[in-house]
């Protein structure tokens, strides 16, 4: 595997890119090849996939509490990516004067759905 397999370790998007997942550290997990592609891995086992997604959602909900609002700069800083990276993904997210409710931030980072 190109750049995804170092000593048998695979980087896995918890919310798959095909599901609207983005590239930020919390959405990435390192798994062995067996953990990644085996029968108990997230690609073959829906329960394991949901377990990882719910864990990520919980972490994001702590970073972005539902009743608070956040601007793109804060979102970018908390997730360790550039403002420009997130601006394009948050264009259609409901906001008031550039302030995004925590629930909407988490929902977008989870690919548009909650688990």
Residues covered by each model-derived region:
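Short cysteine-rich loop/turn motifs with clustered Cys
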Residues: 1-10, 32-35
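Short linker/helix segments within small regulatory modules
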Residues: 15-28
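Short Cys/His-centered divalent metal-binding micro-motifs
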Residues: 28-51
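Short, amphipathic alpha-helical "recognition" segments used to contact nucleic acids or chromatin
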Residues: 52-70
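Short alpha-helical "recognition helix" segments of helix-turn-helix
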Residues: 74-76
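Short Lys/Arg-enriched helix C-cap and helix-to-coil transition segments
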Residues: 91-115
């Amino acid at each position: 595997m190109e750049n995804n397999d170092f000593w048998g370790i695979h980087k896995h998007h918890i919310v798959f890119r095909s599901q609207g997942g983005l590239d930020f550290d919390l959405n990435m997990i390192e798994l062995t090849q067996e953990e990644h592609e085996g029968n108990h891995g997230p690609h073959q086992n829906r329960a394991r996939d949901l377990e990882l997604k719910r864990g990520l959602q919980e972490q994001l909900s702590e970073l972005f509490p539902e009743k608070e609002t956040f601007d793109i700069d804060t979102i970018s800083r908390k997730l360790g990516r550039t403002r420009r990276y997130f601006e394009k993904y948050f264009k259609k997210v409901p906001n008031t004067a550039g302030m995004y409710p925590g629930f909407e931030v988490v929902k977008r980072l989870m690919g548009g759905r909650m688990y």
